[in-house]
A protein has these predicted regions:
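A contiguous loop/helix-start segment that scaffolds small-molecule binding in enzyme catalytic cores
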Residues: 63-161
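Class I SAM-dependent methyltransferase SAM-binding "motif I" and its flanking Rossmann-like core
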Residues: 1-64
């Protein structure tokens, strides 16, 4: 984007594309199997996207049946975005909705936590939530089974076992 806007040529830049695993998928795997069917990712960083747009996106997806991966939930300078996100989610989702938190995925300080939507706003001041954290918000079918988040695909009602 910057190269193009400055009149540069892509041929002048030597680069290599290395396929990877998105943070939401990596974090979802650490939590169990919460990201099946439809999933939406929303960043709470307002450095390049105005908070009004972020709120509008949250308002659009919160009442739907998506699981939601939230990136960049908290920074030292930007705390109110996380609180506003929690308010919007609580307007549209059950307070008992399972929440998975992964701090520092694949790093030495990796930490995971399962909680519920009602408790999530209280965790904003805790060390587990910062810019290296990904939060997975379950949908109306998500549940916790043996310390794992599970969003069923519906096989148990479709097939006779």
């Amino acid at each position: 984007e910057i190269l193009e806007s400055k009149g540069g040529s892509a041929e002048a830049v030597d680069f290599e594309v290395v396929p990877g695993v998105p943070a939401a998928q990596s974090c979802g795997a650490r939590l169990g199997a919460p990201l099946v069917n439809d999933t939406v990712s929303v960043s709470l960083s307002d450095h390049l996207t105005p908070m009004e747009e972020i709120e509008s996106r949250l308002e659009a997806v919160a009442p739907e049946g998506f699981t939601i991966a939230i990136y960049n939930p908290w920074s030292r300078k930007r705390r109110e975005n996380f609180q506003r996100c929690c308010e919007i989610l609580l307007e549209h989702r059950d307070p008992d909705t399972p929440i998975g938190i992964v701090h520092g995925a694949s790093r030495d300080d990796e930490e995971t936590m399962l909680t519920d939507l009602e408790t999530l706003p209280e965790l904003g001041e805790e060390d587990i939530i910062d810019m290296t954290t990904t939060i997975i918000v379950g949908n109306e079918d998500t549940y916790v089974f043996e310390d794992r988040m599970v969003t069923p695909r519906g096989y148990e009602t479709k097939y006779d076992y």
